[in-house]
């Protein structure tokens, strides 16, 4: 299926690129999220009119992501959770808890920007967690997981 990208898509292309993808990828991901439109003659003409506007919006998003990355550089955040005497957590810490801790510290982060590809955190300790703020911008933050003070 031939599409025109409306924004930069990792491992696929930039704004305005005409790409050929499998129909399922187009139907289930690119089209519903507004990342692409079918490459019909009407859409091609319409896109050429809007190209400057879309590129300006993309540049603004990139600048905002870089500014947020600069704020997050060399920062560490502390999260407390119930843990056993051996340091195993009762439960786990996932993207939602990490995003909430960073947001409470004053920097807006969405849970979808937290990249816990290695799985949720289940032990007390310090972890380097990558944040993907934009397709071109990522930053690592330190997350310190500490046990809550409890009488167990």
Curated annotation (Swiss-Prot):
One Pfam family from the UniProt entry? Ribosomal_L9_N
List, in alphabetical order, the GO biological process terms annotated in this UniProt record.
translation
Organism superkingdom: Bacteria
Asked whether the UniProt record includes Ribonucleoprotein among its keywords, one would answer yes
**UniProt gene name:** rplI
What are the alphabetically sorted keywords of the record? Answer: Ribonucleoprotein, Ribosomal protein, RNA-binding, rRNA-binding
Q: Which GO terms describe its molecular function?
A: rRNA binding; structural constituent of ribosome
Q: Which family does it belong to?
A: Belongs to the bacterial ribosomal protein bL9 family.
Any one GO cellular component localisation term in the record: cytosolic large ribosomal subunit
User: Native species of this protein?
Assistant: Coxiella burnetii (strain RSA 493 / Nine Mile phase I)
Specify the taxonomic lineage. Answer: Bacteria, Pseudomonadati, Pseudomonadota, Gammaproteobacteria, Legionellales
Q: What is this protein called?
A: Large ribosomal subunit protein bL9
Function of the molecule: Binds to the 23S rRNA.
Please give the InterPro entries that the UniProt record associates with this protein. Answer: Ribosomal_bL9, Ribosomal_bL9/RNase_H1_N, Ribosomal_bL9_bac/chp, Ribosomal_bL9_C, Ribosomal_bL9_C_sf, Ribosomal_bL9_N, Ribosomal_bL9_N_sf
């Amino acid at each position: 299926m031939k599409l025109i990208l409306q924004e930069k898509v990792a491992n696929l292309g930039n704004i305005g690129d005409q790409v050929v993808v499998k129909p399922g990828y187009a139907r289930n991901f690119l089209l519903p999220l507004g990342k692409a439109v079918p490459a019909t003659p009407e859409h091609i003409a319409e896109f050429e009119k809007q190209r400057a506007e879309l590129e300006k919006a993309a540049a603004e998003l990139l600048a905002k992501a870089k500014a947020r990355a600069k704020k997050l550089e060399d920062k560490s955040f502390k999260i407390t959770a119930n843990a056993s005497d051996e340091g195993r957590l009762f439960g786990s810490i996932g993207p939602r808890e990490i995003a909430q801790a960073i947001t409470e510290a004053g920097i807006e982060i969405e849970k979808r920007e937290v990249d816990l590809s290695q799985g949720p955190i289940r032990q007390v300790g310090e972890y380097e967690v990558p944040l993907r703020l934009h397709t071109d911008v990522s930053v690592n933050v330190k997350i310190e997981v500490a046990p809550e003070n409890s009488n167990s």
